């Protein structure tokens, strides 16, 4: 199986008869990351449900979908589908806008109970891919934001990104900026390949069972952080690279996932997240003690 950082690798889809078997199945439980693969889309289009299980046993218990999460996620899905422009700001200097509607909204609530639905045990996250060329502005990673892919670490120093027409045109900062540039450059297929620097899926987390501090509590083992870091309520997840999962044409391994704290998110000028706190009551789900 491919490592955590190798997204879009064909894996089991290459095995004779496997694709046909999965397309005929009701549900498949992958224990690796099948996202951005062609075979996954084929199976989902055929109606197969997928529940990805890639986190540690303690986290599977803690992050299991609480009562009301699916209802809140479906509400958020409706809001995001109706949105045409998103603006993301922060006191750290982020001011990013993008248009949406060209690609589907993808929603996870922690279980796969609908035909053709993909989910992640521990999920509670929503995202879409921005319309081609529409993302523009500045994104600032601040200390405490999380690089969960390809690394598994809190950001230590500010990283300033300039985004122009859907691509990151400049990366400034110290160690964290160097780590980002080196990874994305290493994923280029040629000198002129800019796909790793494209803006990929953008969205936010809503699972009250997750918390920002879990990475500090559990250490930098990806198995303990794959879901929790992406789904804690009010984070804005910025990413780079592929968009094939949404039906786009960018197929690159240069994927970078950064759940950001303290951002404000506006859907068509209406605030749903204020400085990292969900303020739309219909997106807020009570935490269950476990």
Spans of model-derived segments:
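Glycine-rich nucleotide phosphate-binding loop and flanking beta-alpha elements
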Residues: 35-37, 210, 244
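Generic beta-strand hydrophobic packing signal
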Residues: 86, 171, 202, 263-265
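Short loop/turn segments at secondary-structure transitions that flank enzyme active sites
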Residues: 104, 145, 167, 208, ...
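Active-site and channel-lining beta-strand-loop segments
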Residues: 157-171, 265
């Amino acid at each position: 199986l491919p490592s955590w950082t190798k997204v879009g690798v064909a894996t089991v889809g290459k095995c004779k008869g496997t694709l046909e078997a999965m397309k005929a199945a009701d549900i498949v439980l992958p224990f690796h990351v099948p996202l951005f693969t062609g075979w996954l889309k084929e199976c989902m289009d055929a109606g197969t449900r997928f529940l990805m299980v890639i986190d540690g046993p303690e986290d599977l218990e803690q992050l299991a979908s609480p009562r009301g999460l699916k209802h809140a996620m479906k509400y958020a899905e409706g809001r995001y589908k109706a949105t045409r422009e998103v603006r993301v700001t922060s006191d750290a200097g982020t001011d990013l806008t993008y248009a949406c509607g060209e690609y589907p909204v993808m929603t996870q609530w922690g279980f796969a109970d609908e035909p053709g639905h993909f989910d992640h045990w521990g999920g509670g996250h929503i995202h879409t891919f921005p319309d081609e060329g529409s993302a523009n502005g500045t994104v600032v990673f601040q200390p405490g934001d999380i690089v969960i892919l390809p690394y598994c670490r809190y950001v230590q120093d500010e990283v300033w990104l300039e985004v122009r027409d859907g691509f990151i045109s400049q990366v400034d900062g110290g160690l964290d900026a160097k780590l980002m540039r080196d990874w994305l450059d290493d994923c280029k297929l040629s000198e002129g390949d800019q796909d790793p620097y494209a803006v990929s899926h953008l969205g936010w987390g809503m699972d009250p069972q997750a918390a920002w501090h879990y990475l500090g509590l559990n250490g930098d083992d990806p198995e303990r952080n794959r879901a929790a870091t992406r789904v804690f309520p009010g984070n804005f997840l910025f990413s780079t690279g592929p968009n094939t999962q949404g039906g786009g044409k960018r197929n690159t391994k240069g994927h970078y996932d950064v759940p950001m704290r303290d951002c404000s998110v506006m859907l068509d000028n209406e605030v749903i997240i204020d400085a990292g706190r969900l303020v739309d009551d219909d997106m807020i789900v009570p935490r269950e003690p476990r």
